[in-house]
Amino acid sequence: MKKILALTLGVAGAGAAAAYLVTDRDTPSSVIASAAAQEAEPVTIWRAPGCGCCDAYAEYLRNNGFKVEVIDDHNFEDRSVEAGVPDRGIGCHLAMIGGYVVSGLVPSEIIERLLEERPEITGITLPGMPANAPGMAAEKSGTLRVYSFGPDGVGVYSDE
């Protein structure tokens, strides 16, 4: 009887040890954070030095899974024109994301859609500094009209 009990306890102990060794002990949040860091889309933002809404927008993008680098640029408007942004479409900063030009405070879900759809355009813009756009407001509210631009001209990309 003692041999059977010892054998049973030995098998149970070995099973528990094996389960411990093969179990992933990372917490779900650390696994998710690690995956998000590996998949973060890099974004470079050129902005007028000291622009507070650009800082808030960069933080907004970071909070939505993008890896953001901000560059102070006294000539970001000239850079915007050189990048193909229409004169009436120049926002408060210029960003390069996934091979696209993004001008202004474009919501992250519209950028994500752009990167998923991969249309044959140069980029998108949210002209001006709408009070309900990310970077100006605590969160996007209401409708924002985002335009696409490229060799075929300018058109509405999104009304969200």
Predicted feature residues:
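Positively charged n-region of N-terminal signal peptides that target proteins for export
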Residues: 1-4
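Local sequence-structure signature of Cys/Sec-based thiol-disulfide redox active-site neighborhoods
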Residues: 36-64
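Thiol/selenol-based redox catalytic cores and closely related redox-interacting motifs
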Residues: 82, 88-160
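Hydrophobic alpha-helical membrane-insertion segments, chiefly the h-region
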Residues: 12-22
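Conserved helix-turn-beta segment immediately C-terminal to the redox Cys motif
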Residues: 58-78
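Ser/Thr/Pro/Gly-rich low-complexity linker/stalk segments immediately outside membranes or between
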Residues: 24-40
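Short active-site oxyanion
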Residues: 42-43, 66-68, 98-101
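Stable alpha-helical elements in mature extracytoplasmic
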Residues: 50, 57, 72-75, 107-111
